[in-house]
Amino acid sequence: MPRRRVSMGAYTDYSPALMTDMYEYTMLDACLKDGTADRKCVFEVFTRHLPEGRRYGVVAGTGRILDALEHFHLSEGDLKFLSDRKVVSPETIKWLENFRFSGTIKGYREGEMFFPNSPILQVEGTFGECTLLETLILSVLNYDSAVASAASRMVSAAKDRPCMDMGGRRTNEWAAVAAARAAVVGGFKGTANLLAAQIYGLKAIGTAAHCFTLVHDDERQAFRSQIAALGENTTLLVDTYNIEEAVKTAVEVAGPQLGGVRIDSGDLASLAQRVRNQLDALGATNTKITVTNDLDEYALAALQTAPVDSYGVGTMLVTGSGAPTCAMVYKLTEREGADGVMTPVAKKSKNKATVPGRKLAFRSYEYNLADCEHIISGSEKALAAYQPNPEWKNLLVDYVDHGTIDPQYQGHDAIMAAHEYRAKALAELPITAQSLMKGEPVIPTETTVL
Amino acid sequence: MPRRRVSMGAYTDYSPALMTDMYEYTMLDACLKDGTADRKCVFEVFTRHLPEGRRYGVVAGTGRILDALEHFHLSEGDLKFLSDRKVVSPETIKWLENFRFSGTIKGYREGEMFFPNSPILQVEGTFGECTLLETLILSVLNYDSAVASAASRMVSAAKDRPCMDMGGRRTNEWAAVAAARAAVVGGFKGTANLLAAQIYGLKAIGTAAHCFTLVHDDERQAFRSQIAALGENTTLLVDTYNIEEAVKTAVEVAGPQLGGVRIDSGDLASLAQRVRNQLDALGATNTKITVTNDLDEYALAALQTAPVDSYGVGTMLVTGSGAPTCAMVYKLTEREGADGVMTPVAKKSKNKATVPGRKLAFRSYEYNLADCEHIISGSEKALAAYQPNPEWKNLLVDYVDHGTIDPQYQGHDAIMAAHEYRAKALAELPITAQSLMKGEPVIPTETTVL
């Protein structure tokens, strides 16, 4: 697959610069007036907790943030809108005219595991430029990581059987594209979504719908038509009327070389067993069985002993299997004071207090298995002097250096690298991570304030 | 607000034509080869059940489908992609070159209540053109209606207090735009999302974030700055450090004309009560109190007696408050046979069987309250001869007539009309609809097959 540079068409007419909450612009306006907009700042993205009972999360979406950053500038239409609605003052409009993010971004890799308080993304720049990114960064990371985290659990539950994204119809049409990408980061092997396949170079997969059988005069004609168009290696949908008859017809029409059959209703385990035996008896021993129908990780685990070859997962994938968002937040942790010195800051809101200071993040291992997430916080000076254990894994990579994006984290190759990385990082966690039993995060997070 | 025609920039480079599952195109390919692609068809969108315990759903998104239809044609890039990936044959590429939907669409209004089996959308055209729309139509209706349905419950629970969408950061960045629109259909009064405000002409609202207080040397300077930029009618965030001190500072800085304060943490009801008393004691009797912090319809109901003036709702709005999708499906119900006669069809899949034949839909009333949803199904001829009770409300309106879109259902005015319509339609349901207790749909759906 050739490496594809992504240029989100969505951002051509509507830039991501207005994919934001109004208060980001009104705060910018006030801070430009009083001079604090130029203060150097560090913002960090983290979540206070994983969804109930989850053992780990999987980071996804960072590459999409980089794509969006490339287009994060205001069009004439955007400026006119902000001006007409009096969202900001004319002076701020002027400031926004040539806006480009010129800061630095570090963070966890896509496909990396995360835990409560992991500093998933760290954005450093002036207050003005960092605050404008808040909503967009959170939208991307909260949704994509929710999908990747659910996908990863499903892939574990499916053991070595491939999982395919078929969930586009059950979420917003653009979320569907992001979900397909995040599913692959989370371990899925392909997607039914053509736009995701086009934009990100993903493998596209598909079978047929019940309407295809119904529009034909009978099932035999439908199967004949599909094989004529797609070849005998196609997958025929066999549960429109009567599964046993459909399987018989399918093998009669395609011959024993038939690629596969799909079952989309009923008791999937016992139906798969019956269909497998029937296919074998008909000589179609290499014909694959794929099943679909509101699958989640628990259903996949229950199907482990059934003779199924692959899974199509829809609703529960794109809605994060009960956790459709990650509760990630974007918080100011350090800023320049009136004296020009960088100072750790934190809010003290009840149950929502934050840890002041920028963070370093490492993972330690014992017998090749992760045993702790170490978050080190402190002043710029203290962190510069800090010597981590050399055997720890440094979890922060450099995404953007003073406005320059590292392209290795964008496009198709980055997604496939994240796909591989997830499998490796998951294998390095205690095996309890792969349990579907509800429990605590599989490793503790220790925060050290220097 | 001037009426805005919507031209989704997202569709300029990436047309909605690839926001679809691959099998729609492979089915088209097979059907073009065997001649069934030209068969006249009727597809219908419905859900088999509401989310557990919900009394009704609210339709939203149909106007966005019309926007997408205007752009539903394949660019050269799209055709090249389908060709390079060998998704379809060269003959099908040719057919797709000038593709425009030329069929007819009827359906429920946006803002209308729906129940199990309500035919929310009815798409009539050739098999080829109708099948290509499946995924996109479902993506839009499933997500937008999930948000509008949750919004409607929240608005009921909030009584007359305005609810504002602040959820953009907790869902995909484009889903956020759709969610803001759907929230207004569902009864919300405004959104923090600027792009939604721009595209759909919605009211934009906002306060300030904790980082705004933190970037300043102290809270007093932050409040001064915000008032200098936005005037004393602005809303100050008072829970960064200590709420009581912040309220005192706020009134000192702004004077008793201060527009509002926002509380985002802790026990909102008791804090609102304390803050109200403090504000009144300081003479700021007209200063409003807005609260935020993972609100859902249950939290809003619990706040009914607290002195709160408005609500900012985030996560639970954009994730459908536990039901992030509506389980709507798009099923072939009638098609032309080899003999040219329209014939009702249905699949017989276990637990997923469908009712054959196109549907009419009416709601009947007793003492001005809805008492039944009537779904009438049958052959084209039987339906043409059918005489409904003249007192029933006909639930299907004409959206598209042979490819021509009725513009009254697009843009800002259509959203505001849907907003009004929802309030009226909800008031016509038995009051149990507004209960948050789990239960059955508030009126039964009766299906009659002629």
Language-model-detected regions and their locations in the chain:
Chain A
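N-terminal, Lys/Arg-enriched amphipathic/low-complexity engagement segments
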Residues: C41-E97
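A residue-level signal for beta-strand positions that form part of recognition/binding surfaces
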Residues: V42-E44, S102, C163, V329, ...
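Short acidic, Pro/Gly- and aromatic-enriched capping/linker segments at domain boundaries
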Residues: I105-G111, W392-L395
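Buried, small/hydrophobic-residue-enriched core segments of structured protein domains
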Residues: P2-R39, H49-P51, V87, I93-S102, ...
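Gly/Ser/Thr/Ala-enriched C-terminal appendages of enzymes
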Residues: P2-R39, E52-R54, L282, T287, ...
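An N-terminal, globular interaction/scaffold subdomain
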Residues: L66-F72, G107-E110, F114
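Short coil/turn segments at secondary-structure boundaries
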Residues: K80-F81, S149-R153, G167, Q434-P441
